[in-house]
Amino acid sequence: MSWFVDLAGKAEDFLNKVDQGAATALTKPNQKSSLSYNSPDATDSTQYNAAAYSSTQQHRDSISASSLGTSTFISAAAGNIKKSKATVLAGTANVSSTTPLGSSSKASSNFVRPRKSEVNDDLLFDFLNSSDPPQSEKKEVRRETVSKAFSPTGVSAQSQMPTVSLASDLHTGPSVTPTPSSTQGLSRNSSLGSLSSSSHSVKTEDSSTRDQSQADVPESLTAGLDDLADPQPVLEIQSQDLQQQQQQQGQEHVISNLRLENQLLRNEVSSLNQEMASLIQRAKDMQEEVNLGRARADKWNSDQSRVDRTVRELSSQVDDLTEALSAKDGQLAVLKVRLDEADQLLKARSSALEEAQNERVRILQDHSEGSSLHSQAVQTLQDRLRDAEAAVKREQESYRQIQSEFAARLAKVEAERQTLAESLTNAERRLTEEKQRAEDLQQQAKSSRSAAEYTKQELQDYKNKASRILQSKEKLINSLKEGSGLEVLEGAGAGVELEELRHEKELQREEIQKLQAQIQSLRTEIQDLETQALTENESWREQLAEVQEQHAQQIRAKQEIEAELERSKQELQYIEEEHHRTKITLQGRVKDREDEIQKLRNQLTNKALSNSSQAELEGRLHQLTETLIQKQTMLEALGTEKNSLVFQLERLEQQLKSLQGGQNSASHINMAAMEGPGARQRNTPILFSDGDGPGTGVYGKVRKAASTIDRFSIRLGIFLRRYPMARVFVIIYMALLHLWVMIVLLTYTPEMHHSHPDGR
């Protein structure tokens, strides 16, 4: 709905201009209409005064008709009220009314004034809404001032007729203009939709009335000038006095009727306010008309653009003609000025020639000094290059020495690994022997268990047999005791046998106890053998795991050393290539500088000191300044290259030192594994040992992450060193990023949402 808001804003601006025109008409009554005839260039004042003069001609007839009767004027006032109502409903400020005598009157409000302050609008609203009597006094004062402006002599009756009609026009003008101001005030508070269609009708009627007023201006102006210029005879003074009295009476009737009309207009304004409330409800229906009006507005805009184009073309033609005339007039003065300037230019050229010669001598001296400084700088750079080459050679020798040390350490590590492998094989052999012994002990334990079970079974059988014998003996004894016919000898023999049996029983019990003690001792021995075998197995397993772990650590350390050696070889190769490239580029640049210096020396020696024209001197001076600037830039570039080479050498020294330190730290070997094969080691946890792999412990993980970051940074530095365009691109990107951030921070203003005082 932005287009709808734009249309409403345009309509509101148009109504504001109409209200400001009415306010200027009320606040400035002393403005004379004769100024419109003296200023033909001001189109707005011409249209306004022409419309006012035509309205005076129209109101002259209305005043003559109002002198006939009051009823006729009241009917005219009613007609004006109806037509002002029609203009409010249509949203226009131009009124075309018809008097009872049939004279067609044109709109007199066809003017647009510049925008005034809000104080004038408030005064206008207070003036229109107030019902105080000073309004008529202001109107009478305005009528007297306008009559004085139109009739300075005060003797012609025809000059007074436009005065009365103009005063009446000024009285009736505000009665027409308050209606759009009231509608404007209501439209600000109620709806913007009803003003969209009214803006189009206002523009069309404004353009039509403007064309009509512009077409009628010459006739009305010629008629008014003829009326003002005609001399009146002295004999018609009495008739003019009578006409003046009649006109005064008619003016009094007009004033009273205008007051009545003002009251009626106020009532009509209140009714129009109610109608505006109903128009708000009809805003939805007006949307379709707005769509149709959009097409008409586009057509009108195209027509207006064509008219503006033609006006601009005509104005441009007029401007071209005026400029051509002014150019023709100014050519003579320009020629005179050019003659003076030519004389001054000759003097200035002669002085400039002397200054150029002095400057040439000074530049030659500066150039000789600059060439000497340049040769010194080139010599120092060559010395630094030789020093850098010597340093590179020293670094290469140190690298070869480090490589030989690495080879010796690697051989030592291989020998240690071989000894560890032999110790591992011995430990495995001992482990197999111990396993065999454990199996033998287990077999012995099984055999002893089976023997114990067999002895237990024999003991149980013997117990059963002895119990059976004892039971039979007891039965025999009991049977003998019961027998009374036994002899004493048999009784004595039975007692002896009984004693023997008891003695055997005791012996058997002792044997059983001995066998039980032997079984218990065998059980304890078997348990001791089992526990000893388990402990020995566990210890051998631990020793085997330790040996395997040490072997894996040695393999990992060897792999790390080999990778570090390969990386150092690659870095050394990169450094050698970089030094070779820098050496070649520096040699090429030194040759180029020497060639340029030789060319400049040849030019200076071969240059003939002959009299030459000023153009040649200026060209040579310009060439010398350019060469001097180039030499200065070359010196600055060489200085920056020198600093970069120094920085690169320092970085290479630091890298070599760090590489040596890393290799020394990586060459440490855990010598705890070199002890005797039978030695028992304690499993103490080691967190920061040098022999740990990169994947074991917190220290290994941290060292692995640091090594990856270091490798990435080294490769990035080598890439940036190898490609200068990448360095330039990174620097430009960072500079542009900071510049953009500064621009955004300095130019950013947060949005502030606030209500517009006019309702827009």
UniProtKB/Swiss-Prot annotation:
The keyword Coiled coil applies. Residues 1-727 are cytoplasmic. Residues 749-760 are extracellular. It holds the Pfam family Golgin_A5. Keywords: Coiled coil, Golgi apparatus, Membrane, Transmembrane, Transmembrane helix. Residues 95-114, 126-216, 432-456 are annotated as: Disordered. It is found in: Golgi apparatus membrane. Residues 95-111, 148-166, 441-450 have a biased composition (Polar residues). One of its GO terms (biological process) is retrograde transport, vesicle recycling within Golgi. The chain crosses the membrane at residues 728-748. GO terms for cellular component: Golgi apparatus; Golgi cisterna; Golgi membrane. One of its GO terms (molecular function) is protein homodimerization activity. The keyword Lipoprotein does not apply. It is a single-pass type IV membrane protein. Residues 135-146 have a biased composition (Basic and acidic residues). Residues 249-668 form a coiled coil. It comes from the Eukaryota. InterPro entries: Golgin_subfamily_A_member_5 (IPR019177). Residues 174-201 have a biased composition (Low complexity). Involved in maintaining Golgi structure. Stimulates the formation of Golgi stacks and ribbons. Involved in intra-Golgi retrograde transport. This is Golgin subfamily A member 5. It comes from Danio rerio.
